[in-house]
Regions:
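Sec/Tat signal peptide C-region and signal peptidase I cleavage site
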Residues: 18-22
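Bacterial N-terminal signal peptides that target proteins for export
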Residues: 1-8
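Bacterial N-terminal signal peptides
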Residues: 9-17
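Subset of outer-membrane beta-barrel
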Residues: 23-391
């Protein structure tokens, strides 16, 4: 696929900024760009209802932090997640996510997930091989599969590692100069869980760190330049506060930073040729590992712009009798780095064997295509299912 065609499809994946920018703001607009941006979409309704803050252990921890699995109460669990994506723009784009885990003994767990992102049907009217219109319908998609192993090093601390295969097919004619892209990546995560006393209440504190998608760049066929995958560092905290025997609150906060170099901006007076040479040297020739370290100090605006590259989320969850749940949250991204700002709400219902959750996005600007995004999660507790068959 030609660059322009793939860029068009990639823009459909990316989260659009809300509203138009004045020219001076456009000059400052400098988001961190990656390929396979579908890897950054939060898949589950629980965290989505809390502003994308996902520190507390649950069946979908594979995405947020797989080191949390040894602290899950149930022996095993499986979840099915579905998100109709950017329905303000298109009617057939969606994300499906399957996740599951199994605890081995009391101190370790294995887990896996499968992600499938469909861009729906896209009509083409140009055949690059003949130069003629063909009215062809294509179905571009991205997918990934990963497995992880987590281990408790003490009663309060655990580590995890995951490996992931990523595949992106945004092409429509498998000619010599274009083909689907694939990449391999790994996650490294740790999690700390402890009980602390706040007044007369024994509260549960969780702190997690996950560096995800550390891996190779991705190349689409004959393109001269490979592209960065979304390597990301996530630091989160959650505090569960019991009110009484039937009621409890959890508050959570996450901070995220893409560990990918910022695309260089053309300097005033710099020729196009010099700029292209500098982009090649400072961006395309940088390896994925070098790019991780470079990402902490390469923003054109200095330290202030580096801080703008940190997205943050805050959320709260109320649980009644381990059955009914209400959630709310807020997600913030600098207007110079993508301008994703939205509130979220969610609700859930849980029985011994299954749970059902939903999340809903309320964007701060109605022009934001994320507005009114829904997520659904159906979870299964293997211990609860076994208990049903024993009755």
């Amino acid at each position: 696929m030609k660059n322009s065609q793939r860029i068009l499809l990639t823009l459909m994946l990316a989260v659009a900024s809300a509203g138009a920018f004045a020219q001076d703001k456009l000059d400052m607009f400098n988001p961190v760009n990656t390929s396979v941006t579908s890897q950054m979409i939060a898949p589950d309704a629980r965290a989505a209802g809390m502003g994308d803050a996902g520190t507390d252990p649950d069946v979908n921890s594979q995405y947020w932090n797989p080191a949390k699995y040894p602290f899950c109460i149930s022996r095993a669990g499986v979840s099915l997640n579905y998100t109709p994506w950017l329905r303000q723009l298109v009617s057939d784009m969606d994300l499906a996510y399957l996740s599951g885990y199994y605890r081995i003994g009391d101190y370790s767990a294995v887990s896996a997930s499968l992600r499938y992102f469909s861009l729906g049907e896209v009509m083409t009217n140009y055949d690059s091989t003949t130069g003629e219109s063909n009215g062809m319908t294509i179905n571009p998609y991205e997918m990934s599969f990963d497995v992880a192993y987590s281990l408790m090093l003490s009663e309060k601390f655990s580590l995890a590692a995951a490996v992931r295969w990523i595949y992106s097919d945004l092409t429509y004619d498998y000619t010599d100069d274009t083909s689907p892209g694939s990449a391999f990546a790994a996650d490294i995560a740790c999690y700390y869980n402890d009980y602390i006393n706040i007044g007369a209440r024994e509260c549960q504190l969780g702190i997690g760190l996950n560096i995800s998608n550390i891996g190779s760049k991705i190349t689409f066929g004959g393109d001269d330049n490979s592209e960065f995958i979304p390597t990301n560092m996530r630091l989160g905290l959650a505090l569960m506060v019991p009110i009484d025997e039937f009621n409890r609150f959890t508050i959570a906060a996450d901070a995220n930073k893409l560990l990918v170099p910022t695309y260089p901006k053309q300097e005033e007076g710099e020729s196009t040729e010099d700029y292209q040479q500098r982009v090649q040297k400072e961006y395309y020739d940088v390896s994925s590992i070098s790019g991780i370290f470079k990402s902490f100090g390469d923003a054109p605006g200095g330290f202030k712009e580096e801080l703008q590259e940190i997205n943050w989320s805050v959320g709260a969850e109320y649980v009644y009798n381990d059955k009914f749940t209400l959630r709310a949250g807020y997600h913030h991204e600098s207007e110079n780095k993508g301008n994703r700002k939205y509130f979220t709400v969610g609700a859930g219902f849980r029985m011994s064997a299954f749970s059902l959750d939903c999340g809903y996005v309320i964007a701060t600007a109605k022009s934001n295509p994320l507005d009114q995004t829904l997520r659904f999660t159906l979870g299964f507790d293997m211990d609860g299912i076994k208990d049903l068959f024993r009755r």
